[in-house]
Amino acid sequence: MILSQKKIEEIAVAVIRDFQKSFFGSEADDPARFALPTPIDQFASDYLNLKVSFQKLSSDGSIYGLTAYVDTEYQIEVDGSQRSIFLKTNDVVLDKSFIEPENIRKLCGKRRFTLAHECAHQILFQLNSDDRKIACHKRPEVRGNGSRVLRTQEDWNEWQANSLGAAILMPQSEVDRAMWFINSRKPLTCYGWRFYDKDQVKIDTFCGVFGVSRSAAAIRLEQLGYLNRKKDYEYRDPLEVWP
């Protein structure tokens, strides 16, 4: 099953609305409130009934997470030797590097997005009868800007999980609220991946609100019309003096 971005947004809206009512109660209905970031750990464990744990998943850090749809065994290679990870239905295993003391803060955004990605796979699995042949899913490392050519069903599955994961972490209604406070709902501007100082402060504020990386925030903001992306060469350093 291949879903459009519009359909993915509709799924996210329905899921988040239901979760917010149960988790935030009457606060979710307050029209004057600030944005409510999704507490993804509670969303995974309390709302989706997923069991989240941490293990070393690869020697080179190339696998961020695994999730299981049925009881299964997954083979991984760590330090040159093969070993098995036994997964129960609804298990999620994230790489243990996320909880190493020096990484807890540094990789917080990546950990949250990886968990949201695995949550999205579980939600999509319930909607997609074609996926019932699959026992588990792994999330590999994504380099660069995270874009990929969508050729296979697996490519589409990954794109859909990334899109739904982003919409769960940064729901459009909550992004609208945040951007009203941060920049009066006006779009930010970036040049490649660079921002002028004032917009850099604003996107960093956005990242702090939603607990996401700058790249994840930029992709989501651009998707929702809150970021204008220009070419690198259009950037002009405000401190640069021209002769």
Predicted features along the sequence, with ranges:
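Active-site hotspot residues in diverse enzymes, especially metal/ion-binding acidic/histidine motifs
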Residues: 1-243
